[in-house]
Curated annotation (Swiss-Prot):
InterPro entries: ATP_PFK, Phosphofructokinase_dom, PKF_sf, PPi-PFK_TM0289. Pathway: Carbohydrate degradation; glycolysis; D-glyceraldehyde 3-phosphate and glycerone phosphate from D-glucose: step 3/4. Its EC number is 2.7.1.90. The gene is Pfk1. This is Pyrophosphate--fructose 6-phosphate 1-phosphotransferase 1. Catalyzes the phosphorylation of D-fructose 6-phosphate, the first committing step of glycolysis. Uses inorganic phosphate (PPi) as phosphoryl donor instead of ATP like common ATP-dependent phosphofructokinases (ATP-PFKs), which renders the reaction reversible, and can thus function both in glycolysis and gluconeogenesis. Consistently, PPi-PFK can replace the enzymes of both the forward (ATP-PFK) and reverse (fructose-bisphosphatase (FBPase)) reactions. One of its GO terms (molecular function) is 6-phosphofructokinase activity. Homotetramer. Keywords: Cytoplasm, Glycolysis, Kinase, Magnesium, Metal-binding, Transferase. One of its GO terms (cellular component) is cytoplasm. It comes from the Eukaryota. It is found in: Cytoplasm.
Length: 426
């Protein structure tokens, strides 16, 4: 009977998020107490996909107590990350299996989003269940994974807090040197981060994909929603403000709108087939169009992106505690014979949830958790914005005032903008 210590392999996939090191530390410290050997694979699946064991060994580190004991305070990940995707071919998956077998990995912990978890489960499906167990800890600052109600993904609280500080500073700047800032916030499919930052900072407008009633968003509608808000504030003598835009608006745009954003070419994609939203330059494109319309009114507009500076911030206390619990939960799940599962926290307890139970049958991918636009939380955020509402359009004095600010007649203003109340939910 072998007395060789079990090997735990850990990797991070996808973009960074505050708290990655906390999961690594939590899992490693618990595993070491059990007498396991712990190794970290550098840059996610990148080197495992080569199938070259020597290359993998050269890019693998032993995770020891001295290395991980204090890293939970730090942003980023000490084992780095990448978007390498072994699901692109059966050969790549077999390469990963070959390397895991060569390094005698018994327990495989991946920290990432749905793509990383899907890759790990796919690799493990080609191995004997007694040969390897796979557990994933869900990670994304987008907060769009289907976790239990009111439970955020780790890193979200930190990203929202830092984003709030940045937007607060922009709001002071916008008033001090009068201008509008159009802030494009990360969030591939959902508007949780954009809305969270906007609500916390008191931004004057926030647009997220979930609030649009139609399946496809037109660029023109987004432009006019911002334009009407700018004119409403101008009518009150305020030629400045901050508008937060979820980059996920791009994911929901019509083909016509996408071609406009990407310069009449097919949108580029990442290794997992996702549109490279950053390349769309949404805030910049909107700024250019709005300046054409409002430049004669003396309105200044500056586009700003918020995203990468949030991903590697040192975690706030909530995420530091949360990620340590997830790391513990992963090892506990291994000890109890679980595999192909994600670790979640519900009612103060961490537990495994089978990966297959989180999949959307129609797409085969993990379900996306969207902002509930019928919730009180969304209504609270919306009521403090400067949008033109249906009630506003019923107020003839207000319409005349806002129209005058835009050098339009009330009739022309209403004809141009009133339909927008049917484009988004109220």
């Amino acid at each position: 009977m072998s007395t060789e210590a079990p090997v735990l392999g850990i990797l991070c996939g996808g973009g960074p998020a505050p708290g990655l090191n906390g999961v690594i530390a939590g899992a490693t410290l618990y595993a070491l107490r059990l007498g396991w050997k712990v190794i970290g694979f550098m840059e996610g699946f990148k080197y495992l996909c080569t199938g070259d064991v020597d290359v993998v060994k050269a890019h693998t580190i032993d995770l020891t107590y001295d290395i991980v004991s204090r890293i939970h305070f730090q942003g980023g990940t000490i084992i780095q990350t990448s978007r390498a995707n072994p699901r692109k071919s059966p050969e790549l998956q077999e390469n990963v299996r070959k390397c895991l077998r060569a390094l005698k990995v018994r327990y495989f912990l991946t920290i990432g989003g749905d793509d990383t978890a899907s890759s790990a489960v796919s690799v493990a499906s080609g191995m004997n269940g007694n040969e390897i167990s796979v557990i994933s800890c869900p990670k994304t600052i987008d907060n769009d994974l289907p976790l239990p109600a009111d439970q955020s993904t780790f890193g979200f609280h930190t990203a929202r807090s830092l984003g709030m500080e940045i937007i607060r500073n922009l709001m002071v700047d916008s008033k001090s040197a009068p201008r509008w800032f159009l802030v494009e916030a990360m969030g591939r499919s959902a508007g949780h981060l954009a809305l969270g930052m906007a609500e916390a900072s008191g931004a004057h407008l926030c647009l997220i994909p979930e609030e649009f009633k139609q399946d496809e968003i037109e660029f023109e509608d987004v432009v006019e929603l911002v334009e009407a808000t700018i004119l409403k504030r101008l009518a009150y003598g305020k030629n400045y403000g901050v508008c937060v835009l979820a980059e996920g608006l791009v994911s929901k745009m019509s083909k016509k709108a996408l071609y406009k954003l990407f310069g009449n070419r097919e949108p580029p994609t990442d290794p997992h087939g996702h549109i490279l939203l950053d390349d769309a330059e949404l805030a910049r494109s909107l700024s250019e169009e709005l300046l054409k319309r409002l430049g004669n009114l003396g309105i200044r507009i500056t586009p700003k992106k918020i995203g990468y500076e949030l991903r590697c911030a040192d975690p706030v206390a909530f995420d530091a505690v949360y990620t340590r619990e997830l790391g513990y939960g992963a090892i506990d799940a291994f000890l109890n014979g679980h595999s192909a599962a994600l670790i979640v926290r519900e009612n103060g307890q961490v537990k495994p949830v089978q990966f297959k139970d989180l999949l959307d049958p129609a797409t085969g991918r993990v379900r996306t958790r969207l902002v509930d636009v019928t919730s009180q939380s969304f209504k609270v955020a919306r009521v403090y914005m400067w949008r033109m509402s249906k009630k506003d359009y019923e107020n003839k004095d207000l319409v005349a005032r806002v129209a005058a600010a835009g050098k339009m007649t009330p009739e022309a203003f209403t004809e141009k903008f009133a339909h927008l109340t049917d484009v988004v939910v109220e």
